[in-house]
Amino acid sequence: MGGGSYKASDWTKLKTSRKIDSSSVDQIFKSRKMDDKFNPKFIQVREARDSEEHPNSTPIAIGVDVTGSMGYLSSEIIKNSLNELMKKLYSTKLVEDPQLMFAAIGDTTDEAPLQVTQFESDIRIAEQLMELWIEGAGGDSPEDYQLLWYFLAKHTDIDCFNKRGKKGFCFTIGDAAFHDSVTGGNIKAIFNDDAKLYRTSELAKMASEKYELFHIDLNAGKMSASKYIPGRVISVSPSEVKYLPEIIIAAIQLISGKTNDDILNGLDFSAKQVVSRAVSTLNVGGSIKL
């Protein structure tokens, strides 16, 4: 997957046809159950492949907590953040041939613990995102963000790593803590894989072999994932959700060895303040400060 290119005009047409700006979360995300095409139980592999059109594919997986209080975040992403992230990725050419996958993350006790789209480079990213079921179950108890790590480690095949030894990127986003493990029964039920218990720390290690892992904590650092991915947790307040595109891009830039000026260039004062603080503690071979 991953053909085509993202165009702002395509997003404008989609927003108009779906009346996204004036619609509620329930009106935007109309699915009331998980579609089999996004159910990891029926997905052997998701691929991010090079092509003549995109010879240097870079997979970026973004997993969003869709339980309980996180409904507002799903709305923000579809209305604003997705378009801004894609526009900036393409206009700045920060990442070669980006291919985005979105994941809806819940808890192993939910009806839909994990849903995953294809890796795409065009408006199909948004179209698939809007087909996900925003289940809204659960509350602020620990969630199972590590299910996405398992899927990326076991069920993705990415040319950037296979051909060039470069890692993809994964950002999980939410306001709850991680569970410490996934039982073998849940692995079997969710992925239809051999039943085996995995510690969350083990899954972080597995996924980090092919992906640069980050967790964006929307609970002001109170639910830190640092014990699983030390130096890769970004603390953001709910009021700063609108800056997610800039924060994600800044983290990718840090991995790419960009300078402080590269990262903050072009941002307005408020964005500079938020981005600088949010990623200043990341351990990626350097950090940025105003």
Where are these regions (language model features)?
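Acidic, low-complexity intrinsically disordered regions
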Residues: M1-L290
